[in-house]
Amino acid sequence: MTITRAITLRTILDSRGRKTVEAEVRTEHGFGRAAAPGGASTGIHEAAVRDPLLAIADAQGQVIPHLIGIDSSDQIGVDSLLHEIDGTDNFSGIGANVAVALSLAMAKAAADATNIPLWQHIGGIFVDSAPRPLGNIIGGGAHASHATQFQEFLVVPTGCERVRDGIFANAQVHKTVYDLLKKRGIRAGKGDEGAWAPPISDPEAFRILAEAISLVSDETGFEISPGIDAAASQLYDPESGMYRYRDGTVRSPEDQVTYIADLIDEFDLIYVEDPLYEEDYEGFAALNREAGNRCLICGDDLFVTNTKRIQEGISHGSANCVLIKPNQIGTLTDTHEAIHLAKRHGMETVISHRSGETEDTTIAHLGCAFQCIFIKTGVVGGERTAKLNELIRIEESIYERK
């Protein structure tokens, strides 16, 4: 039932109008399709992405023939073979975009062959909840020019009983922020992920977000909490070892730790992602010691879903949370190993989209299967709401099993 009979690779468009890789896998009784997303703010240690057209052309002769006849339900075997064919430690041979599309499509085909959803195929009987949505409301940094310095101002409905209600609340915060900007006479377009990208300072963004959260929390009757993705590697100047802000402020690594800790206290942030340079394990650790008891200190560029880097972070005490992006590491098995390592050491995990997304909903299934605390996949835009709507459906199925 799960033996691979045919594989198709094609180029499709992502949400930024760029070409990416989509894979289709057909088994005797199953079908799976998956697409590779792409990032704008990428860590220097991420798995290598190749030009989609060239990668697909090479894969036709170098990859696909080796996968025909393999058992798609043997995920470890599939992913080990992808590594073997590639022959590098970062998928620079076949391309991480080809690898992740094939790996996920294989898993979906195996699930389809046994007539169960992907989240159940991977998570089995242990799945009893869905991750809460971590939504991007105001954006800047690499996602939008002439906007905020920090890349993302986020919200998460920490007080909602059902994830469905949290998804709707995030959308209401998004709309309320627009209304507050309009009231102030501030025009705002949208960034790559659908967040508002107004020409305002970071302090003003914090104030507007706090006001919107208060209004929507009162309306919904449950708590909504703020967070940020600082994407601090983009602020860091390697030559001087300092963080340089657009307003002329220059902060040392120690000052950056103090600044972020003060923001956590001032605005009751419950989630801070990439607050320091992606090689600064000690700086992360200092912030984690200072604020990790009241806030998730999350590494994205620091860890890039890589077990070696996560282990390094564990040895330093650098963070209490790991962002998980399957395309950063290349396969479902590698993704699972990263999550397992983090959880074994008491760290939370957050499954995440990329700025360049497709309508693929796989991460909604992975977030449930691996019991991640949050799913970071935007608030609006078809490629974002596809995942959120799938999460609503999955949550219904989980409740039906209870």
From Swiss-Prot:
| Enzyme class name | lyase
Write down the required cofactor(s): Mg(2+)
Residues annotated as binding (2R)-2-phosphoglycerate are: Q151, K325, R354, S355, K376
Q: Does the keyword Lyase apply?
A: yes
Q: Which GO terms describe its biological process?
A: glycolytic process
What organism is the protein native to? Methanospirillum hungatei JF-1 (strain ATCC 27890 / DSM 864 / NBRC 100397 / JF-1)
Identify the pathway. Answer: Carbohydrate degradation; glycolysis; pyruvate from D-glyceraldehyde 3-phosphate: step 4/5
E.C. number(s) listed in UniProt: 4.2.1.11
- Show the GO cellular component annotation of the record: cell surface; extracellular region; phosphopyruvate hydratase complex
Reaction catalysis annotation = (2R)-2-phosphoglycerate = phosphoenolpyruvate + H2O
Q: What is this protein called?
A: Enolase 3
Note describing how the cofactor binds: Binds a second Mg(2+) ion via substrate during catalysis.
> Which parts of the sequence bind Mg(2+)?
D229, E273, D300
Q: What job does this protein perform?
A: Catalyzes the reversible conversion of 2-phosphoglycerate (2-PG) into phosphoenolpyruvate (PEP). It is essential for the degradation of carbohydrates via glycolysis.
Pfam families from the xrefs? Answer: Enolase_C, Enolase_N
Catalytic residues of the enzyme? E193 (proton donor), K325 (proton acceptor)
Per UniProt, subcellular location reads as: Cytoplasm; Secreted; Cell surface
User: Which is one GO molecular function term here?
Assistant: phosphopyruvate hydratase activity
Q: Which superkingdom, per the lineage?
A: Archaea
Per UniProt, which keywords does this protein have? Cytoplasm, Glycolysis, Lyase, Magnesium, Metal-binding, Secreted
Please report which protein family the annotation says this sequence is part of. Answer: Belongs to the enolase family.
